């Protein structure tokens, strides 16, 4: 019997042992597949397949059909026949069970050699139930109503067999090998069952090339359609595991309870090979029961993870929920990348179009495309390409998920390495590390927040400590300075001088010195203003500077507006003359001259429009600056008032302290006769007197300055009023108003119709020039009045302010009068020029 190359294992019995006279022929299938022979050093003395031993002759057989007592097999042939019947029964009972092929290999070896025609049945996966109901059904299959029902196993041993298969299925799918002892019922006496040599002796070698050869032989057998034999298993086991397994299987021959060993060690290659047939025969084998759905992804086998029927992942709804949550964000990331691609493609197309437009000379199109390209480049810069998984939010979530996975992986070996073989498997087995991760995260967050709060408290404490230390350092510096001053006078020994004083004098000098040192702390010579007063002075100074700048801007704007108005007046003067000359040229059929005049008229009109637009903008700017100047002036005046009040209060305090110090010094001088102290106090008294004089001078100077300003403003106002009241004696011709000049000119030009147009043109220029000069003089006068108004506001001179307002009102009335006089002159000039033009045209027709 060549068990080394066989896919199934024999049912070993004493009749199969060498030297036994009652040997029976093995139950070999009629179509046995020819296998590759192995070298001699790779063969074992017997079949290496691990199978459960058949009961020996004389083993008690319990009767299940209500019979009592025990029966014994009369001969080895009967035992052999029953073993064959048991093999056929196991084949029939296992055909309908969806056992995993990778886990079935060793188990089928222990049951019996299957017929080759039943290869499809053998390749089906074994389904092992987890709960007690599945255990009962499996035990009924293994100890059913066949010829050998409960002949070798009692009901307890069959349940143990089912439990061992369950444990082997749940742990063999994770690559673990489980050896379960199955105890037969007790007999009347000990049964001597000889152990098989092939069962215990498994070929092992310490040479690496031999182990590689064994692995290669197993792979060849697997490639030919046969499952690898048990000899290849030492390649996947350590020497310690093999020694433990050998010692566990080596039982005494006289033991009444015999071991039936099942090894469900499924190789990864077999599991992958089983997937091909399982995916095709899954409807026949049936679905995994709902009790098995409790296995998580780390508990499932690799083949089960790639199954088409059970979905591949536990808790698929949770994963779908995560996908629904992150799908919009992923789409946003991808949309950004897609948009970047579109922008890049569009840039290339527009660049080609731009080159073509440049070649064709269409520079307008090229400029448009250039602007569009710039916009696209900016958009491309705002769309940086990046992997969605590298985005901060998703990357953080993936890191958290990796932490959960790591904890779950650490929890799986703890469940798989349980040493209790009788512990029941539960349908839903979750790792506690995964459940405790959210709690750990919350705990970690709370700890971090507490640490941050603690650090903030420590920082505040350190800051307070630093402020205390700084104050202490200042105090120590002052004391150190005092000590240094004392050390400077240690060389001068005054003991001889002091020893000459009487006790009364010593007491008097000591008291005077104490008062002097005490009064030095509140000496009035610290006349520096407080911090609030200094800051208010700085603010007042900055506001004064702002007022000056804004005033300069307003004045320059007014000057520019005046220049623009003058230029506009010149253009308004030129336009009627040009129109008149154009009409004359047309009436005289001088079309070339008329064309030139029309072009000049168009240029003048364009310039006038531009100047008007610029003047409007300048007026708006000047108005805004004026409003801003008004607000800044208000702030400046308010600060000036506050500054004056605080300075007055400060001077009052200094003056009061000076008076108090003077009184104290005078009292000390009258009661102390120490020459040194008397001289010191006299110097202090003189200093106080000087300070009082300084304060009085400052008060007198401020009052005199205000009076001088008032006098200056009043003098300037009187001079300006006199200048306005007594104007210069004009020329007799200048005394005429523009309207009078226009009327005289109309009377004079009535007798000269032919040269009226030219004369009127010259006279209009003269009139407008005179009026413009007068307007400019009035404008300058207005600027001067504005400066005077600012000075009056700064000096708080209400009288000067009122007089200047009256003068401004008078100047405004003068301007209004001149404007009213100028309007009829313009209308009269326009009518005269029109009449002259009509007269010239009629004369030309005649």
Curated annotation (Swiss-Prot):
BP terms from Gene Ontology: canonical Wnt signaling pathway; cell proliferation in forebrain; cerebral cortex radially oriented cell migration; cilium assembly; detection of temperature stimulus involved in sensory perception of pain; microtubule cytoskeleton organization; mitochondrial calcium ion homeostasis; nervous system development
Modification after translation (UniProt): Ubiquitinated. Ubiquitination with 'Lys-48'-linked polyubiquitin chains leads to its proteasomal degradation.
Region: Necessary and sufficient for interaction with PCNT and localization at the centrosome, residue numbers: 435-846
Stretches with biased composition (Basic and acidic residues): 133-143, 248-257
Interaction with NDEL1, as annotated region: 795-828
Region (Interaction with MAP1A), start-end ranges: 1-288
GO cellular component: axon; cell body; central region of growth cone; centrosome; ciliary basal body; ciliary base; cytosol; dynein complex
Positions of the UniProt region annotated as Interaction with ATF4 and ATF5: 588-846
Region (Interaction with NDEL1 and PAFAH1B1): 721-846
Induction: Up-regulated during neurite outgrowth upon differentiation with NGF.
Residue ranges of the region described as Interaction with TRAF3IP1: 289-686
Coiled-coil annotated spans: 440-489
Protein name stated in the entry: Disrupted in schizophrenia 1 homolog
Native source species: Rattus norvegicus
């Amino acid at each position: 019997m060549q068990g080394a190359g066989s896919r199934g294992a024999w049912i070993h019995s004493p009749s199969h042992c060498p030297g036994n006279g009652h040997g029976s022929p093995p139950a070999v299938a009629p179509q046995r597949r020819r296998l590759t022979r192995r070298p001699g050093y790779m063969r074992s003395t017997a079949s290496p397949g691990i199978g459960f031993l058949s009961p020996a002759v004389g083993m008690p057989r319990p009767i299940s059909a209500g019979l009592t007592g025990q029966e014994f097999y009369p001969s080895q042939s009967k035992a052999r026949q029953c073993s064959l019947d048991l093999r056929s029964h196991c084949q029939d009972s296992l055909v309908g069970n969806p056992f995993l092929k990778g886990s079935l290999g060793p188990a089928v070896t222990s049951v019996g050699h299957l017929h080759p025609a039943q290869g499809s049945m053998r390749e089906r996966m074994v389904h092992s139930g987890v709960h007690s109901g599945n255990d009962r059904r499996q035990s009924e299959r293994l100890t059913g109503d066949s010829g050998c029902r409960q002949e070798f196993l009692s009901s307890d041993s069959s349940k143990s067999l089912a439990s061992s298969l369950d444990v082997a299925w749940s742990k063999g799918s994770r690559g673990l090998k489980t050896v379960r002892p199955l105890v037969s019922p007790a007999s009347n006496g000990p049964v001597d069952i000889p152990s098989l040599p092939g069962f215990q002796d498994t070929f092992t070698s310490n040479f690496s090339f031999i182990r590689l050869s064994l692995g290669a032989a197993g792979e060849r057998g697997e490639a030919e359609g046969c499952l690898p034999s048990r000899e290849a298993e030492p390649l996947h086991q350590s020497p310690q595991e093999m020694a433990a397994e050998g010692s566990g299987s080596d039982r005494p021959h006289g033991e009444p309870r015999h071991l039936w060993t099942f090894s469900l060690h499924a190789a990864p290659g077999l599991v992958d090979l089983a997937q091909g047939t399982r995916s095709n025969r899954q409807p026949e084998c049936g679905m995994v029961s709902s009790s098995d759905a409790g296995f998580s992804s780390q508990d499932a086998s690799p083949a089960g993870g790639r199954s088409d029927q059970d979905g591949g992942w536990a808790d698929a709804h949770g994963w779908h929920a995560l996908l629904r949550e992150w799908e919009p964000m992923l789409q946003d990331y991808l949309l950004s990348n897609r948009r970047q691609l579109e922008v890049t493609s569009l840039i290339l197309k527009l660049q080609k179009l731009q080159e073509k437009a440049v070649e064709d000379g269409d520079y307008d199109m090229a400029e448009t495309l250039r602007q569009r390209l710039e916009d696209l480049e900016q958009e491309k810069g705002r769309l940086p390409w990046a992997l969605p998984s590298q985005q901060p939010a998703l990357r953080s979530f993936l890191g958290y998920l990796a932490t959960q996975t790591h904890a779950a992986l650490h929890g799986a070996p703890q469940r798989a390495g349980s040493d209790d073989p009788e512990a029941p498997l539960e349908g839903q087995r979750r790792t506690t590390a995964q459940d405790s991760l959210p709690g750990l995260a919350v705990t970690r967050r709370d700890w971090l927040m507490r640490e941050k709060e603690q650090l903030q408290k420590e920082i505040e404490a350190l800051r307070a400590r630093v402020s205390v230390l700084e104050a202490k350092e200042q105090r120590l510096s002052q004391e150190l300075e005092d000590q240094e001053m004392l050390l400077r006078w240690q060389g001068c020994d005054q003991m001889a001088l002091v020893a000459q004083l009487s006790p009364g004098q010593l007491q008097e000098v000591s008291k005077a010195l104490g008062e002097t040192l005490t009064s030095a702390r509140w000496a009035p010579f610290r006349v520096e203003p407080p911090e609030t007063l200094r800051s208010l002075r700085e603010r007042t100074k900055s506001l004064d500077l702002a007022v000056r700048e804004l005033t300069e801007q307003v004045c320059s704007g007014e000057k520019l507006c005046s220049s623009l108005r003058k230029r506009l007046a010149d253009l308004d003067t030129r336009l009627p003359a040009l129109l008149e000359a154009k009409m004359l040229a047309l009436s005289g059929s001088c079309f070339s001259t008329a064309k030139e005049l029309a072009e000049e008229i168009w240029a003048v009109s364009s310039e006038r429009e531009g100047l008007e637009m610029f003047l409007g903008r300048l007026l708006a700017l000047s108005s805004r600056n004026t409003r801003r100047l008004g607000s800044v002036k208000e702030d400046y005046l308010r600060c000036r008032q506050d500054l004056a009040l605080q300075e007055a209060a400060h001077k009052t305090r200094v003056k009061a302290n000076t008076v108090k110090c003077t009184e104290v010094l005078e009292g000390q001088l009258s009661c102390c006769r120490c020459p040194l102290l008397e001289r010191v106090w006299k110097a202090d008294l003189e200093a106080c007197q000087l300070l009082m004089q300084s304060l009085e001078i400052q008060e007198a100077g401020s009052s005199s300055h205000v009076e001088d300003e008032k006098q200056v403003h009043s003098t300037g106002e009187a001079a300006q009023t006199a200048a306005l009241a007594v104007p210069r004696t004009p020329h007799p011709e200048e005394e005429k108003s523009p309207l009078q000049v226009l009327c005289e000119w109309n009377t004079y030009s009535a007798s000269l119709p032919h040269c009226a147009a030219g004369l009127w043109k010259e006279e209009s220029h003269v009139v407008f020039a005179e009026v413009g000069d007068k307007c400019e003089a009035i404008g300058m006068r207005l600027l001067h009045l504005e400066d005077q108004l600012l000075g009056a506001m700064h000096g708080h001179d209400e009288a000067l302010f009122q007089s200047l307002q009256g003068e401004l009102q008078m100047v405004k009335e003068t301007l209004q009068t001149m404007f009213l006089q100028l309007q009829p002159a313009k209308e009269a000039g326009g009518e005269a020029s029109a009449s002259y033009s009509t007269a010239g045209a009629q004369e030309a027709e005649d």
